[in-house]
Amino acid sequence: MADTHPLVTVETIVLVGLGGFAGSNLRYFVGLFFPGLQGTLLVNVCGSFALGVLVYEGLQVGALASETKLAASTGFISSFTTYSTFAVETVLTPEWAVANVVGSYALGFAGVLVGREVVRLFAGGGQ
């Protein structure tokens, strides 16, 4: 394991924190306009798409710095999306439970796949 200068570690923590601040505030804002299951589904699908873009950008292009990917994924996307709210809302709405679980997972996986295709398109048809 390589030694990392303490300022680099502090910078990384600050970047993740700023990403988390932005993601959680956007999550709150989305919830104001789309309360309940709809808002949770929307942020989780958008987050799946965004994470798919980040992962496949790293695999196929590699233009983003590791700090940028960390701030975007661990900071922003992880605070924007919400598995715990998804679980609670599913339990609290038994009439929608199966549809919510199946729909959330199907759309989440679709979001990742669309993210992959967007990267392929912009990367010039890479792998």
From Swiss-Prot:
It catalyses: fluoride(in) = fluoride(out). Belongs to the fluoride channel Fluc/FEX (TC 1.A.43) family. It is found in: Cell membrane. Coiled coil: none annotated. The chain crosses the membrane at residues 6-26, 29-49, 95-115. HAMAP family: FluC. The lineage of its organism: Archaea, Methanobacteriati, Methanobacteriota, Stenosarchaea group, Halobacteria. Fluoride-specific ion channel. Important for reducing fluoride concentration in the cell, thus reducing its toxicity. It comes from the Archaea. Disulfide bonds: none annotated. The keyword Transmembrane applies. This is Fluoride-specific ion channel FluC 1. It is a multi-pass membrane protein. InterPro entries: FluC. One of its GO terms (biological process) is cellular detoxification of fluoride.
